[in-house]
Structure formats: structure tokens, C-alpha cells
């Protein structure tokens, strides 16, 4: 984007970060890489660090720590002179328009979770700009991927050794909620699928790639025992996207063998490893005899019930929460309001079966729809029929409720562009950036699917949201498309 505003912002990044370049160049590349990997690992477990190390439970502390980590990542990613980059005009307008709407809403309605517009307008674009100027961006992405892989493997070891599986229940790994576990898993699945895509694209032999298949099988196993339906849909969407893209590429270059081989190997290894993994989670914690149980642990049963249910926790909120009463769904109901919002609410009425299948989400959607306005609300949560609901279980609806309807329209444009641009990125840069080319569309498509029934948007509260916002760094850069094959 060639506007004066974007040039001004990029010039600001150049002035602030250029003095660090000679200092960072004195540090060995291996050390810089390890620092980046450590920062991403810290960001992945940021919530745990704030809560159990700093003994805090606050959006403020998470945000401060997250911004600090982004600053460190930006500095240690410097390797040459910073220059202006061409940013995609449509995406830039939608992105910064969304940020402006968020900030305006924060100004008129003070929020418990404020400042998202500033973070997305100034903090993350600074890292985007540095990465776009780096001569080895593939290594930067490798540091992120390695951080997630290391964290996942550590989590798997702890889970197999100390987190027991209860018969008739849903497995949550090291988390207290299997749905939260599942949302992290779809991000991990996208990362390993990008490795599989690289293996297929480059014709890598199985003896050199078998660990990728084993770890993908482990992710699919965890998804299965967590029974997290949203995560299952996201994983299916990512897998279907990969198959479609590889089929389209096969029609272009007439290379089908590696794609079919990769898919069949994944299916075979998953089937073979599943009973082994299942036996591990059932018996190893009992053999060790030192199970790790948290005070917040809730046993979610396969039939939808839960023992000692305490609700999903997103932010620590102590003030009064806005309340709304929604009548129980009836089989038939006349709705006389003729507005678009009224007709939408009416279409949700009378659908008791769908409401049960979606675990009451229809009632939640109706409650949030009735509270929409142009300025937004102080909170994310809402009390529906006397019961506290953590969030809207839909990102578009949550943005409309928290930041106002105009902000939701900008976010809608952003999500559409993210899917289109990420697929374009893969199609034109799969060879140049083979090690992470599929990660970008995998993250974007998985996130859009997941946020149809869940709420993920604060980058330093939940890692899937961070990964989605962070993926825009490559989508912003127009010069990649110009230099593509």
C-alpha cells in the first residue's frame, strides 16, 4: 500500500528499530534463533506464566507480557537495513479500518479487555514489517513452528505420564477443558500439515519424514479423545483444503504420486498408532501413580454432561455482568418485527433440536443479537436466562457485541480476505516457502471454521488467535506475489 499513512507507519518502524540492527548483527544467528524460539514458546504458554509464575490473573498482565515478547521478537529478527514494503491496499484498508473501529469503541465504552485496536495497528505490524525485510524469513517461521512442536511434545509427555483418562469422559490433556485443548490442537495440526505438504512438494523419503506422520497421528488421536466438535470441524477443513490444493496442483504439474502416498501413509499410521496412544493414556498415569489434577478440572462426559461444571473462563471479571432473558425455543412463533435483525432472531426461534445439538448456542446467539448496538459493550460475557455465558461462541457476533456493528463489518472483510489471500500465497509461493507455505492457509481456514462456534480474538489470551493475527504478516506483503514464479 503506497498511501502516506502506510509510509508514515513504516518510516516510524524504521526509525525505532534501525538503531538495533548493528547490535543484533553481533549476536550469532544460532543464538538469535534460539531466543526467537524461546519467545514463541513463552507466548504459547503466556496464560500459564502470568497465572502460575507472576501469580496474576489479568488481561493487563497478559497484554504487557505479550507486547514485550513481540518487541523482543522484532529486535532479534533484524538482519539487514529496513526498507519500505508494498502492502496490499485492500487488506491494509480493512485491517486499519477495523483497528480504528476497535479504538473508537474503546474510547466511548471503557472495556475490561481494551487496546486490541492499538495492538493490531502498531505492535503486530511492526513485527510483520521486520519479518518482511528479513533475508531468511523461512528460518523465522521455523523458529515459530519449532516452538509449537517442542511445546506440544512436552505437553504430550506430561499428559501420557500424569494426566489420567476417565472412562466415559472427554480427554483434556494438560488443559482443564477438552474444548480448549481441541482449539490448540487444530493449530498444531496445521503446523504439522505444513511439514507434510513440504515433504510431498519436495518428494522427501519416508525414512526422513516418519516423525511428521507419527506426530500428526498423535494430534488426530488427541482430537478424537477430546471429542471437541469445533476442533474436529477445523481439522477436517484444513485436511480437505490440503487435498483440494494438491489435486489442483496435480492437474497443473501431473504429479499425483507423492500426494496420494502422503495421504495414505497418514491414514495408515493414524490407524496403527491410535490403539497404542489410547492404551498409553489409559494405563501409563495409573502405573506412574502420581496424577496431576487441577482445582479447575471438570470431567466433561461423552453424553454432553459434566461433573462439577463451573463454566468456561475467559477473563477474570468481578463487576456486574449485563443480563438478558431469552424465552425457550418453541416449535412455532410469529415474529412481527420487520428489521433484518428481527428476521434473523425469528429464524433462530422454534429450533429446539438445533439448540440442543449446538449445546444451547442458538439461545446464546439470540441473546447477543438482541444486545447489539453501534458503540459496543464493556464486557465479553453476558448473563443469559440467569446463567453466565463466557462469550458469544461466534467471533463475528462477539466483535459486533463488544466493539459495535461497524467493527464487525470490517472484521468480516478481514476474514474473507484472509482466506483468499492465504490460498493465493500458497499457490504462488509454495516452492519458495515450502517449509511453511501451507501453514498460512491452514491457520486462516481453520480459524474461520473454529470461530463459527467459538470465540477467539485476544492474541495474548489464546494462542490460536495469536497465530491467526500473526499469519497476516505474509498476507500484507504484496512484493511476494510480484516476485512469485
Each predicted region: which residue ranges?
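Transmembrane signal-anchor hairpin modules in multi-pass inner-membrane enzymes, especially those
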Residues: 1-100, 195-208, 254-263, 476-485
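Transmembrane alpha-helices of multi-pass inner-membrane enzymes
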Residues: 440-448, 456-485
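TM-adjacent membrane-interface loops and short helices in multi-pass inner/ER membrane proteins
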Residues: 309-390, 405-409
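Alpha-helical transmembrane segments of multi-pass inner-membrane proteins
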Residues: 139-167, 176-251, 274-276, 280
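Transmembrane alpha-helical segments and their membrane-water interfaces
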Residues: 72-81, 99-157, 182-198, 249, ...
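Hydrophobic transmembrane alpha-helices and their immediate junctions
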Residues: 403-445
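Interfacial transmembrane-helix termini
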Residues: 45-67, 81-90, 99-123, 135-140, ...
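A membrane-periplasm/extracellular boundary helix in multi-pass inner-membrane enzymes
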Residues: 225, 249-349
Amino acid at each position: 500500500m503506497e498511501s502516506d499513512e502506510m509510509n508514515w507507519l513504516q518510516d516510524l518502524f524504521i526509525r525505532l528499530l534501525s538503531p538495533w540492527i548493528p547490535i543484533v548483527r553481533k549476536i550469532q544467528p544460532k543464538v538469535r534463533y534460539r531466543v526467537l524460539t524461546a519467545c514463541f514458546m513463552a507466548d504459547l504458554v503466556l496464560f500459564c506464566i502470568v497465572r502460575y509464575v507472576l501469580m496474576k490473573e489479568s488481561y493487563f498482565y497478559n497484554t504487557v507480557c505479550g507486547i514485550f515478547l513481540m518487541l523482543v521478537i522484532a529486535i532479534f529478527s533484524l538482519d539487514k537495513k529496513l526498507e519500505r514494503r508494498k502492502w496490499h491496499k485492500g487488506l491494509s484498508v480493512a485491517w486499519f479500518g477495523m483497528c480504528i473501529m476497535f479504538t473508537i469503541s474503546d474510547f466511548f465504552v471503557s472495556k475490561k479487555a481494551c487496546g486490541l485496536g492499538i495492538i493490531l495497528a502498531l505492535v503486530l505490524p511492526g513485527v510483520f514489517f521486520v519479518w518482511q525485510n528479513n533475508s531468511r524469513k523461512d528460518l523465522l517461521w521455523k523458529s515459530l513452528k519449532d516452538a509449537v512442536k517442542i511445546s506440544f511434545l512436552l505437553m504430550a509427555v506430561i499428559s501420557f505420564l500424569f494426566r489420567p483418562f476417565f472412562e466415559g469422559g472427554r480427554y483434556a490433556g494438560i488443559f482443564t477443558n477438552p474444548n480448549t485443548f481441541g482449539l490448540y490442537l487444530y493449530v498444531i495440526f496445521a503446523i504439522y500439515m505444513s511439514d507434510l505438504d513440504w515433504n510431498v512438494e519436495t518428494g522427501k523419503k519416508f525414512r526422513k519424514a516418519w516423525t511428521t506422520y507419527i506426530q500428526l497421528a498423535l494430534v488426530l488421536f488427541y482430537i478424537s479423545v477430546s471429542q471437541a466438535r469445533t476442533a474436529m470441524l477445523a481439522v477436517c477443513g484444513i485436511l480437505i483444503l490440503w487435498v483440494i490444493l494438491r489435486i489442483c496442483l496435480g492437474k497443473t504439474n501431473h504429479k499425483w504420486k507423492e500426494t496420494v502416498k502422503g495421504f495414505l501413509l497418514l491414514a495408515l499410521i493414524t490407524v496403527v498408532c491410535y490403539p497404542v496412544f489410547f492404551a498409553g493414556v489409559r494405563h501409563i498415569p495409573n502405573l506412574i501413580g502420581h496424577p496431576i489434577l487441577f482445582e479447575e478440572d471438570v470431567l466433561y462426559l461423552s453424553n454432553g454432561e459434566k461433573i462439577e461444571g463451573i463454566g468456561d473462563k475467559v477473563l477474570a471479571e468481578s463487576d456486574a455482568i449485563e443480563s438478558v432473558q431469552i424465552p425457550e425455543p418453541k416449535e412455532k412463533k410469529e415474529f412481527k418485527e420487520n428489521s433484518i435483525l428481527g428476521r434473523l432472531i425469528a429464524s433462530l426461534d422454534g429450533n429446539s433440536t438445533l439448540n440442543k445439538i449446538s449445546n444451547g448456542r442458538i439461545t446464546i446467539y439470540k441473546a447477543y443479537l438482541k444486545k447489539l448496538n453501534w458503540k459496543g459493550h464493556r464486557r465479553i460475557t453476558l448473563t443469559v436466562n440467569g446463567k453466565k455465558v463466557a462469550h458469544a461462541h461466534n467471533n463475528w457476533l462477539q466483535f459486533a457485541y463488544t466493539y459495535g456493528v461497524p467493527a464487525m463489518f470490517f472484521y468480516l472483510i478481514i476474514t474473507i480476505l484472509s482466506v483468499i489471500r492465504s490460498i493465493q500465497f500458497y499457490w504462488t509461493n509454495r516452492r519458495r516457502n515450502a517449509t511453511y507455505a501451507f501453514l498460512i492457509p491452514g491457520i486462516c481456514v481453520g480459524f474461520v471454521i473454529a470461530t463459527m462456534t467459538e470465540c477467539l480474538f485476544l492474541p495474548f489470551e489464546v494462542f490460536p488467535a495469536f497465530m491467526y493475527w500473526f499469519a497476516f504478516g505474509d498476507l500484507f506483503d504484496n512484493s511476494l506475489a510480484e516476485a512469485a514464479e
